[in-house]
Amino acid sequence: MKISFPAVPVTNCDERPAGELPSLVVVHAISLPPDRFGGPGVEQLFTNRLDPAGHAYYATIHHLRVSAHYFIRRGGELVCFVPPERRAWHAGVSSWRGRERCNDFSIGVELEGCDSLPFEGAQYETLAALLAELCDRFPVEGVAGHSDIAPGRKTDPGPFFSWSRLRRILLKAGRADVAARVEPDEVGQGGDPDRRRWPFPLGSRPL
């Protein structure tokens, strides 16, 4: 799998707790500026170079110190910001299966997208391939959305992300073992647009 890396090293990360291996993959969505794609904003945010004068929204977030392990652009290109062995700062206040501090034991994957538009086929293909690789390398038990580990606080990856499509790609690739770890239920968690029943207000929540 072809992976690119940011021009500037990411410092918004640290070490996981001793002996901790990632057991969860969290799927996010991000667009900077909101609902616009293809620009340098995401890399600038993760490398602490976001210009607050570059966009009105940037003035509200440029101070944040956040990151993710991976970023999948609209065309399917994969960028690695933080090695999966290290702890990226992507989950915030969160809980999964009764355990808090999901950053400690999760891998964060940001898709370039928003709550109001479908994701691209190339993004699903790259995500499926990445999940298969991560499940081969680490004891991953589940794949969940940011909204699943921070319900009511986060909405991403949003109602236009199709968990069933991701599962189908994994099954077609012969990775039923990985598909079985994709947790969210389409009904009540967003998913396919024709089935969405979103449990909290929508909005462009890129972080």
Q: Model regions: which residues?
A:
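Basic/polar, cationic surfaces and motifs that engage anionic cell-wall
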Residues: 1-3, 18, 100, 105, ...
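Active-site-adjacent loop/helix surface patches within enzyme catalytic domains
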Residues: 1-18, 24, 29-141
